[in-house]
UniProtKB/Swiss-Prot annotation:
<protein>
    <recommendedName>
        <fullName>ATP phosphoribosyltransferase regulatory subunit</fullName>
    </recommendedName>
</protein>
<dbReference type="GO" id="GO:0000105">
    <property type="term" value="P:L-histidine biosynthetic process"/>
</dbReference>
<dbReference type="Pfam" id="PF13393">
    <property type="entry name" value="tRNA-synt_His"/>
</dbReference>
<dbReference type="InterPro" id="IPR004517">
    <property type="entry name" value="HisZ"/>
</dbReference>
<dbReference type="GO" id="GO:0005737">
    <property type="term" value="C:cytoplasm"/>
</dbReference>
<dbReference type="InterPro" id="IPR041715">
    <property type="entry name" value="HisRS-like_core"/>
</dbReference>
<comment type="subunit">
    <text>Heteromultimer composed of HisG and HisZ subunits.</text>
</comment>
<comment type="pathway">
    <text>Amino-acid biosynthesis; L-histidine biosynthesis; L-histidine from 5-phospho-alpha-D-ribose 1-diphosphate: step 1/9.</text>
</comment>
<dbReference type="GO" id="GO:0140096">
    <property type="term" value="F:catalytic activity, acting on a protein"/>
</dbReference>
<keyword id="KW-0963">Cytoplasm</keyword>
<keyword id="KW-0028">Amino-acid biosynthesis</keyword>
<comment type="similarity">
    <text>Belongs to the class-II aminoacyl-tRNA synthetase family. HisZ subfamily.</text>
</comment>
<dbReference type="GO" id="GO:0016740">
    <property type="term" value="F:transferase activity"/>
</dbReference>
<keyword id="KW-0368">Histidine biosynthesis</keyword>
<dbReference type="InterPro" id="IPR045864">
    <property type="entry name" value="aa-tRNA-synth_II/BPL/LPL"/>
</dbReference>
<comment type="function">
    <text>Required for the first step of histidine biosynthesis. May allow the feedback regulation of ATP phosphoribosyltransferase activity by histidine.</text>
</comment>
Amino acid sequence: MNNSEQLIALKESETAFLKYFNKADYELVDFSLVEKLDWKQLNHEDLQQMGERNFWQHEHQIYALRNDFTDQLLRYYSMYPTAATKVAYTGLIIRNNEAAVQVGLENYAPSLANVQQSLKLFIQFIQQQLRDNVHFVVLGHYQLLDALLDKSLQTPDILSMIEERNLSGLVTYLSTEHPIVQILKENTQQQLNVLEHYIPNDHPALVELKIWERWLHTQGYKDIHLDITAQPPRSYYTGLFIQCHFAENESRVLTGGYYKGSIEGFGLGLTL
């Protein structure tokens, strides 16, 4: 496929996404690539993200190029509430001076049923329009770390070793028998079963992970992995997250996660 054909295919995929979810009764939204920001309203995490963002000042006003749709929509709807419970978007995001096209969905005040329905529809779009399918799924939950590791041990060094799956370092700091070390020693396909030995069966994170595992099995997905190493990109990501890796285009990953800040929601996004 030459450059012109790739460009046409990309634009057609964006349009097809909007048509598909418009037909499914999602509200289509179109936000400017340029965000107007107020320094006084930016929190510590907003300021930390400025390192990857392109921003400038004009007449005492700060402007920045969008780097995350969920964050932009959350910021906007916090100021201007919407009655919409499910929205669909497409457009550019700019991170570290690199541009990419993203398509995605946001479910506000989400229920398990409507989030799973959104994921099901998204995968159907991938199958029908992108001619691809989900090869394997990664599940995780941002409450797991607190369940497995005492707050006093959640130092930058230890968190970094967990993220890097540095078992030798973790053994030194935590011990061989520590739950995190024991879980990480297992194949990721087995870790969800092993997790049951280290946290109560009624722990909300484990209950939710098991519900999703069962639902994914009913959808025909058996290759399911647990990730206990991921740490939330923003503090409002407090619950379950999911990554659906593609069979044909291995660079593509459909990602999603639950968040609760000024607005509660569950987002699903895919970079084309």
